Amino acid sequence: MAEEKSSGCSPESCSSCAHAGSCSSAKKDLKAPANPYSQVKKVIGVVSGKGGVGKSMVTASLARMMVQQGYSVGILDADITGPSIPKMYGVHGSAVGSEAGMFPCVAKDGTKIMSVNLLLEHESDPVIWRGPVIAGVVTQFWTDVMWGDLDFLFVDMPPGTGDVPLTVFQSLPVDGVVIVTSPQDLVQMIVEKAYNMAKKMNIPVLGLVENYSYLECPDCGKKISVFGESHIDEIAEKLGVEVLGKMPIDPKLAEIVEQEKFYEADNQYLKNRSEERRVGKECRSRW
């Protein structure tokens, strides 16, 4: 039975309400309007049930794959307290704006990026905000940023099922989510949490991506399961979703990230990786 809404409940407070998925107020359309200078065709959330699975890496990999195939792409970095997307692309400095809104920063490959790190005086300054404030900033990245014409906007979300994922699902017109995981013992329970949240919010799950799936020996080519054997296929079958890819641990990719040159990743990593191409193909084929 649905939870009764608390006294003083209103649609505006849903982003931080424990009963947002079940009360009558939550069923209203709370979608925030996009900036008038934004024409975004598809919004894809990249989520995970827990941290440490390389979600930002998968987000950037999906974005690079789309750019490589000629699409216009943006990344909304919704991981407010742990942003990493700008640094991966070598994007520094401050975002600028006008009366019409904020301009996203543009990486060397044309990827448009907005992140809280682009608004801080110093990149190393911590963001010590409570949940509702963080959720409000994420919404503003949609309403106040002039994204322009985009084929895909990828939303890199913080791990878990808290305020930010709830805000994104309620406030942005999310067309689908990709769930990122890794081969560990508790993976099934964690994946199911993310999956169940998306389903409760009526967001389509495009599929699962397993990161850190294996390490390929540079001498013999043998695939080594560093973090244990993969269970992603069984989990996907149980949930009735696709396995979009199994991404390996690749020292070359780590080096690109360290050099802040992810805009070159198509030449050094993605170009010959059929797994990542398959992920991109799946995202396109759903529409």
Which residues does each predicted region cover?
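C-terminal lobe/tail of nucleotide-utilizing enzymes
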Residues: 2-28, 197-278
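Pre-Walker A adenine-sensing motif
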Residues: 29-37
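Walker A/P-loop phosphate-binding motif and the immediately C-terminal alpha-helix
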Residues: 37, 42-80, 195
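Residue-level signature of catalytic and energy-coupling elements of molecular machines
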Residues: 40, 51, 77, 85, ...
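Phosphate-binding loop that captures ATP/GTP phosphates
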Residues: 72-73, 78-123, 128, 135
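Phosphate-binding/switch loop-helix module in NTP-utilizing enzymes
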Residues: 120-168
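Inter-motif core of Ras-like GTPase G domains
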Residues: 146, 165-186
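Single conserved hydrophobic/aromatic residue that forms the stacking wall/gate
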Residues: 275-287
